Amino acid sequence: MSENGHDRRSAQRREEILATATEVFFAKGFSRTSIDDVLERIGGSKRTLYRHFPGKEALFTAIVTTFSDRASNFAPATQSGELRPLLLELGQHYLENLLSRDVVAMFRMAVAEAPHFPEVTKVVYENGPKRACELLAKKFTEHNRNGREKIDNPAEAAQAFLATLRGDLFFRVLLTAYQPTATQIKKSVSVATEQFVKSHVTSSG
């Protein structure tokens, strides 16, 4: 097998391990899951698994990082210079991902395991809320260079916009079995956008 072929196979095996481990961790939680539980589902040897992940903690952290990245990655927005379309697009992408089944399950699991595995909550924070604020602040700064409306203090404004987007809806989904409709998510984004524009935006013209 060529080196490229071996690399592709290794990457595929890593993704298979991650996908299976995610199902097991979500079903049993971190503390009640063992490497043997994962291997029982996916097959193979411990040696192969440890070649990709040196232990259960590393495997769990990789899962958390994957879903945290999904929640904090914003879709590329059209740079039209118009602020409301930008906010609506970014807000819709963020809230849809944040409220998705897998991301919510990841947050629940991380919080439940925090007393025993505090490194996980740090990974969640740095790859989730913190990274989202940093990326959004960067987009706000870019908008200020080209847009007709200016966002006051992009770093603080990013925190405020994301907090308004999450609002009560995120905690309702996180702590109950509630599942918002697409219409409800769209409305939440619209309301958050209007509140944000009123409190954090000034006209340059």
Predicted segments — roles?
Residues 122, 144-194, 204-205:
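Hydrophobic/aromatic-rich alpha-helical bundle segments in the mid-to-C-terminal region
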Residues 13, 56, 63, 67, ...:
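Hydrophobic/aromatic residues within well-ordered alpha-helical segments
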Residues 47:
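Key DNA-contact positions within bacterial/archaeal DNA-binding proteins
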Residues 17, 55-60, 70, 120, ...:
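Short amphipathic alpha-helical segment with a characteristic S/N-K-E followed by hydrophobic residues
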Residues 27, 61-91, 96-98, 102, ...:
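Amphipathic alpha-helical linker/stalk segments
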Residues 1-44, 52, 57-58:
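Basic, helix-initiating cap at the start of DNA-binding domains
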Residues 88-121, 162-169, 198, 202-204:
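Helical hydrophobic small-molecule/effector-binding pocket
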Residues 85, 104-105, 109, 119-145, ...:
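Amphipathic alpha-helical packing segments from all-alpha helical-bundle domains
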